[in-house]
Every structure is written in structure tokens, then in C-alpha cells.
């Protein structure tokens, strides 16, 4: 995985999501601490019932399925994004996001 390529890919996500120290919820929730986090648990973000009740714990495989087609993975999600179909881009994006701990600091 290429973290720098993942950072470039994250530009597609940045209009709605934030990562890093001082990140705040936007249209979408903060993505700090994503690996191992339960879906629908970021404080202060108004998740859809579908997201809160999905039972998802984020790992690479789940993320890749979700980011391929968010509305297919979680019908009823508020996320309005067509998805990322390219396998390498998905891997790079996961590598980029995975480096941020829950506090937004890089591991």
C-alpha cells in the first residue's frame, strides 16, 4: 500500500470527512481511529439509523466492500458517494486512514 497515494485519494473524501489532529465532523464523521471502530460511534455526528445499526466494525476488508459501493453495503446510509472501484486505490486509502489514531495523531 502507498500511503502517499492514499493521501491523494483522500482528496475525494475531504469535502465531507476530516482526519488528523484537530479534525472535526463535517457532512460526514471524522475518520480518525477507523480500524477497529464500530460504525456509527463518533460523538456529535448524526448518523443514519442504518449506519448506527449496521453492526460493522471497520477493518480493511469491510472498508473495501463499503467504499466500493457504500449504499450497497449499508442500505439507507447518508453517504452520497459513488464509491472507489479500483482495488489498489482502496488499499492505498485504507493505508492512509489507518495511520491516524483515535486522537488524530499518526501512529
From Swiss-Prot:
Protein name per UniProt: Cytochrome c2
Protein family: Belongs to the cytochrome c family.
Localization annotation: Periplasm
Heme keyword on record: yes
Positions with a binding annotation for heme c: 13, 16-17, 79
Keywords carried by this UniProt record: Electron transport, Heme, Iron, Metal-binding, Periplasm, Photosynthesis, Pyrrolidone carboxylic acid, Transport
Domain of life per record: Bacteria
Protein species of origin: Rhodoplanes tepidamans (Rhodoplanes cryptolactis)
GO molecular function: electron transfer activity; heme binding; metal ion binding
Amino acid at each position: 500500500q502507498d500511503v502517499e497515494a492514499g493521501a491523494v485519494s483522500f482528496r475525494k473524501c475531504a469535502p465531507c470527512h476530516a482526519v488528523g489532529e484537530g479534525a472535526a465532523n463535517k457532512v460526514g464523521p471524522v475518520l480518525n481511529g477507523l480500524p477497529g471502530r464500530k460504525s456509527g460511534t463518533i460523538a456529535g455526528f448524526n448518523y443514519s439509523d442504518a449506519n448506527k445499526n449496521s453492526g460493522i466494525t471497520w477493518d480493511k476488508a469491510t472498508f473495501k466492500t463499503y467504499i466500493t459501493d457504500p449504499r450497497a453495503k449499508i442500505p439507507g446510509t447518508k453517504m452520497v458517494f459513488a464509491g472507489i472501484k479500483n482495488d489498489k486505490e482502496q488499499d492505498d486509502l485504507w493505508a492512509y486512514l489507518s495511520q491516524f489514531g483515535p486522537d488524530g495523531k499518526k501512529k
